[in-house]
């Protein structure tokens, strides 16, 4: 029986699906209430005025207006606010 024995299978060959994180609306862009501004893991960006924070730390607009990024506080934290137009 001149048959080749089955070779071992590779232990690589899998990867997790990308989670599409990141900034969805940039500074100066107009948004409507409920629009997602940032999808993130943890609080890389913090919620400022008129911005809500979901349980997965997603930041979203609570009012219509323009997106404003700012760095403030003693720890130089990045805040995102919505400024009414």
UniProtKB/Swiss-Prot annotation:
InterPro entries: Ribosomal_bL27, Ribosomal_bL27_CS
Domain of life: Bacteria
A Pfam cross-reference name: Ribosomal_L27
Cellular compartments per GO CC: cytosolic large ribosomal subunit
An example molecular function term from Gene Ontology annotations: structural constituent of ribosome
NCBIfam families recorded: L27 (TIGR00062)
Name used for this protein in its record: Large ribosomal subunit protein bL27
Organism the protein comes from: Edwardsiella ictaluri (strain 93-146)
Phylogenetic placement of the source organism: Bacteria, Pseudomonadati, Pseudomonadota, Gammaproteobacteria, Enterobacterales
Gene: rpmA
